[in-house]
Amino acid sequence: MRVVLQRVKEASVTVEGTVAGQIDQGFLLLVGVTHDDTLEQVNWLADKIAGLRVFEDEEERMNRSLQDVEGKILSVSQFTLYGDVKKGRRPAFTEAAKPDVANELYEAFNARLRQQGIIVETGQFGAMMDVALVNDGPVTLILEK
């Protein structure tokens, strides 16, 4: 599982002209699932993200977690995170999980975050989406398990 995390001041995802999810301060997560991912990896990443201290404290040090600042998450599935561009000019997506497997693990990932008291908004799995954000920092991390 691969997650691109962006600390945001606000973010939204629109599907067919309708806002599917939006947040103020928090994380925009782009979530990719590969074919050999497990529930153990999903839970590890969700727990890691919930506890990451990447928000500034009074001394402007990254010392506060999403829960400390009462932030939210906008989680967007993105199979293209497993695009392989080693050969040719068009990405191959053979490392991305099949949609039924990916959706199940993506939903489990979001559920694990919610179990920790975090509000999680989402896009629509498998849909073409427009994602808008105001990056804060910018702070962008790539997490993989």
UniProtKB/Swiss-Prot annotation:
Keywords: Cytoplasm, Hydrolase, RNA-binding, tRNA-binding. A motif (Gly-cisPro motif, important for rejection of L-amino acids) lies at residues 137-138. It comes from the Bacteria. One of its GO terms (cellular component) is cytoplasm. GO terms for biological process: D-amino acid catabolic process. GO terms for molecular function: D-tyrosyl-tRNA(Tyr) deacylase activity; Gly-tRNA(Ala) deacylase activity; Ser(Gly)-tRNA(Ala) hydrolase activity; tRNA binding. Its main location: cytoplasm. It is found in: Cytoplasm. It is an enzyme of class 3 (hydrolase). It catalyses: glycyl-tRNA(Ala) + H2O = tRNA(Ala) + glycine + H(+); a D-aminoacyl-tRNA + H2O = a tRNA + a D-alpha-amino acid + H(+). Its EC number is 3.1.1.96. The keyword tRNA-binding applies. Homodimer. An aminoacyl-tRNA editing enzyme that deacylates mischarged D-aminoacyl-tRNAs. Also deacylates mischarged glycyl-tRNA(Ala), protecting cells against glycine mischarging by AlaRS. Acts via tRNA-based rather than protein-based catalysis; rejects L-amino acids rather than detecting D-amino acids in the active site. By recycling D-aminoacyl-tRNA to D-amino acids and free tRNA molecules, this enzyme counteracts the toxicity associated with the formation of D-aminoacyl-tRNA entities in vivo and helps enforce protein L-homochirality. Belongs to the DTD family. A Gly-cisPro motif from one monomer fits into the active site of the other monomer to allow specific chiral rejection of L-amino acids. This is D-aminoacyl-tRNA deacylase. The gene is dtd.
